[in-house]
Amino acid sequence: AVGYVAYSSATDTNGKILQINGVLPSEKTIDNNSYPLCRDYYLAYNGELTDVEQDFLTYVKSKGQDIVKQYCIQADSTTTFLSDKSEGKILIEGSTSMEPMVKALADDYQKQNPNAEIEVKATDSSRGITAVISGECDFAMSSRELKDYEAELLETKVIGKDAIAIVINEENPLENLTIKQLTGLYNGTYKNWDDLS
């Protein structure tokens, strides 16, 4: 069997992580994009932000990066943050991969700004993007790039980076897959490990 998991949670995985195109996922190979299955974590939003939404986004891109690096590779260097104490409620919906990190960001931000109330709802990236486009939420959590039409409608900020780690049984002697082989495993071109030779 072959499976996949977010690299950031791969330490909890029983199994062997494979190289893809000869590259293992690591902080270095994800940060420099040499690992082929990297992905950015985005917060997407509709145009103008309220004061509290802007304050939260400023926090995420500055002091919040301390929280981000506990979950994945930070997108920005950590800097100081002083909340303007804006009042309001923020609704965030989307990626289940991002939900624990964004909840931690929301919790820490609300300590910085007790006038803010943030609700984080895990669905999936596409549902979050649809919800922010339709005005059902203020930010979408997306662990995929936006499609062209989505990118025309929304602004995005990269808040962290991660990768998809491909995992197999530890007893399997395989060490590396090409992208073509990986695609073939998932689309049924290859039915068993011997087909990869």
What is each residue range found by the language model?
Residues 1-197:
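Exported/periplasmic ABC-transporter solute-binding proteins
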